[in-house]
A protein has these predicted regions:
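Alpha/beta-hydrolase fold active-site loops
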Residues: 56-57, 134
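Short beta-strand segments
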Residues: 60, 91-94
């Protein structure tokens, strides 16, 4: 009985020590270059944000279960249409923990545009301090953080801000 308890404690300590090594606590600040996080699209193909270099990148961090996220989506689509032809790309990044919830939300919500899934990559959420969603982030054409907490698409200031960007 004591041996079982010792073995159990050994595994518990090993798990805690092992998980600490995997946690990336780096938090990004304005002006920081965005790391190479890997995301998946609905077909399973891997992508990184560096693929979008040369354009401003407006990131919408959302989840299928998030009502405020879904409420912003029509405004995001409208903003994307207004900015068509400009030097900006809009991308949705789902932080759903389960892939089928994300893909189901894509189908049910008839969500268009570029949609990626974090695929369990919690370091993305930690780096951007995205502990609450929806979260909107803006990267500059060089892949640097311009805004960590961008205003929502439903806020009229968002469009005004974007139109004032250099070489938009």
């Amino acid at each position: 009985r004591n041996l079982f308890f010792i073995v159990l404690m050994f595994f518990a300590v090993f798990q805690v020590m092992g998980s600490e090594k995997q946690v990336d606590t780096t938090e990004l600040k304005k002006g920081d270059k965005c790391p190479e996080f890997v995301f998946k699209d609905a077909r399973g193909k891997e992508h990184t944000l560096s693929e979008l270099k040369g354009k401003y990148v407006f990131i919408d961090v959302w989840a299928s279960w998030c009502y405020p996220c879904r409420k912003e989506y029509p405004y995001l689509q409208e903003l994307e249409k207004k900015m068509e032809g400009k030097n900006i790309v809009f991308i949705g990044i789902s932080c759903d923990h389960i892939e089928w919830r994300w893909t189901g939300a894509l189908k049910m919500g008839k969500m268009g545009g570029v949609q990626w899934w974090i695929a369990g990559n919690e370091s993305f959420l930690k780096a951007f301090r995205a502990d609450r969603i929806p979260r909107f982030i803006l990267l500059d054409p060089k892949g640097r953080v311009l805004e960590l907490n961008m205003t929502r698409p439903s806020d009229s200031e968002t469009e005004k801000y974007l139109l004032k960007l250099k070489k938009i």
